[in-house]
Amino acid sequence: MKWVTVDRLPQYEGQTVELRGWVQNYRSSGKIQFIIFRDGTGVCQAVLFIKDVPPEVFEAGKRLTQESSIIIRGSVRKDDRAPGGYEIGVQDLEIVQIAEEYPITKKEHGTEFLMDHRHLWIRSNRQVAILRIRNEITMAIHQFLQENGFVLTESPILMGTAAEGGATLFETTYVNDEPAYLSQSGQLHVEATAMALGRVYTFGPTFRAEKSKTRRHLIEFWMVEPEAAYFTHEDNMRLQEEMVTYVVRRVLERRSKELQLIGRDTTLLEKVEPPFPRITYTEAVEMLKKLHKPGDEWEPIEWGEDFGAPHETVLTQQFEKPVFVEKFPVKVKAFYMQPDPENPDVVLGADLLAPEGYGEIIGGSQRIHDPELLKRRFEEHGLDMNTYGWYYDLRRFGSVPHSGFGLGIERTVAWICGLEHVRETIPFPRLLNRLHP
């Protein structure tokens, strides 16, 4: 008998198949037992009629508990009333394990309780849908970049220096007793591989010990960081809007059921297409001043100050599509960003803010390629030339203009799924006060 998965049941209508999975729910009405069955690919209803199965099979069904693991064999029939639209007429039931009393029941549970039981909570329909959408986003990014000539490369997770100035580091001790740090970004190393391969990207976890307890912050999160030789600031933004559009369209096309299950209104997602609106940092500062009203919980900023999450929220509410905010002051951005030749007080960099209040999902820039300018930036930021000597070498041996960006996977998932908090975007989130499970 063929072992099939729930998502493939429409292909086997009228046939007898085997399914392997778990009991999501169970009820009995005397001579009929109803099992809501899940296997990770979907949910279906399995029905045991006392007259259709041997007595020992019907008795086995009475023992089932929530999350018991089972193997069922039976005929596939279409039933629009059943979850998933298909039903299994059970002919045989094999119990793999009877689960103990399951802690997550139909009643409402608080967030902390669910996070304490995250290893079990991820089995719920909503969490499965979110994780499938996350997978679709990840695979779409890989496919887009590969099709556009980018080579996947790896940056180290153990670093001898910090990639981003100002962010808090996780420090450990290396084998020779020198300090080492968990990576905050793969960017500096991916700049080196871009000089070897032309167009590259790295995809991996990053770690920032920021004491931020907001709906947008994780201590450990995943980033994709493309870098391309000879790319300008304009090329960089064009790549970003093309990639984000590709990802959103792919999710809408392939994960519509999951989006519907989690209750996502896709009206604005369907409007995502190039070109994205662009405003300068200076225009954004002025916009915030005009939008501010007495009694607002946020205050406008002056030119030269960085945005906070409330400012990004307000800005994104003015646009239906993701919006670029570009040309930030030099002093609020990282040392490696290329100044604008038309105005050296600002950099050729941009943040891409997702609409509906989600804020920054991408930060990117053209990088400094002039060795003397980079040396001055080292001095201004108090960076040790010996420590960053290898990075400086990239400007000594065939330096070229180049650009790149970092996209945060969790924030992107939160936006596309319409989630209140990033904690649901990854199987086991690492939050300010949560290291377990």
Swiss-Prot record:
Q: Which domain of life is it from?
A: Bacteria
Q: Which coarse location class applies to the principal site listed for this UniProt protein?
A: cytoplasm
One GO cellular component term noted in the UniProt record for this chain: cytoplasm
Q: What is an annotated GO biological process for this record, any one?
A: asparaginyl-tRNA aminoacylation
Q: Give the EC number.
A: 6.1.1.22
Query: Carries keyword Metal-binding?
Result: no
Instruction: Write out the GO MF terms.
Output: asparagine-tRNA ligase activity; ATP binding; catalytic activity, acting on a protein; nucleic acid binding; transferase activity
Q: Under which main EC class is this enzyme filed? A: ligase
Entries under PANTHER family matching the protein: ASPARAGINE--TRNA LIGASE, MITOCHONDRIAL-RELATED, ASPARTYL/LYSYL-TRNA SYNTHETASE
Kindly give the NCBIfam families that the UniProt entry links to this protein: asnS, PRK03932.1
Q: How does it assemble?
A: Homodimer.
Family, according to the entry, reads as follows: Belongs to the class-II aminoacyl-tRNA synthetase family.
Protein name, please?
Answer: Asparagine--tRNA ligase
What is the organism of origin for this protein?
Answer: Symbiobacterium thermophilum (strain DSM 24528 / JCM 14929 / IAM 14863 / T)
The taxonomic lineage of its organism, from the top, reads: Bacteria, Bacillati, Bacillota, Clostridia, Eubacteriales
Q: Which gene encodes it?
A: asnS
